[in-house]
Amino acid sequence: MVAPSFESPPVRLGIVWYRVPDETPDADGEDVEYLDPSTESGAALRLLDPRLYDGLASVVASGDRSVAALAAAGVLPLDTRTFDDELTFAGQAGRTERAAFRVDWLSRALAELAGCAVVFVDPDGGLRRSDHKRRSWHPKAVKHAYLDELGPFIGRGQSVIASHHTKGSDKVRKQARRLMGDAAEELGVEPLAAVRADRGSTRLFLVLPVDAHRSHLERRLTALTGSPWAAELDVIWRE
């Protein structure tokens, strides 16, 4: 979920990309029709933030759809800090080695994003409870962030916004409520909302504010519900 502004926000943003090795073949990212302003949907999206739209379109058109290219395109707030070390278990034969690598990877992310007020977490597959049957050291767990990995950021006073892919079996609002409940249970922080985005695949953006940022983030989400962005993003408040 890219912030719809090039300006520096009142709070500094950090991003953990959860970058994993490229997979071939992989259909992820093939749906880019929305970045064609000659289409009805593309034209509507561009009106929301022309500079952001054009920046993303230029990255896709260049063929270099990397984290570095995204940063170079200037589509993020000016003082954003990012962590994009690859999360891979290649060469890690056993569970102990994989678990240790993941702990070290998270430690590096924490060090890189020290000083950021809000941290955006962007795993390919979304969020999982820490007691999920496929634990974080599983060879195929790298596409997910586990809720307990968000705890160290929150514990040192950073609010977290985390991207999550919904599943097809349950209604999205039900999934959002369950996700917010899981986060409250595991992290001891009261979620503010989950923001739903339906273009392409449905995603939720879980908003976990620390007390110092709660009122500011609540005002921003309330403003979003009355803005043109409300046609694209649905705020599901915590009940």
Residues of each region from the PLM?
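Class I S-adenosyl-L-methionine-dependent methyltransferase catalytic core
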Residues: 1-239
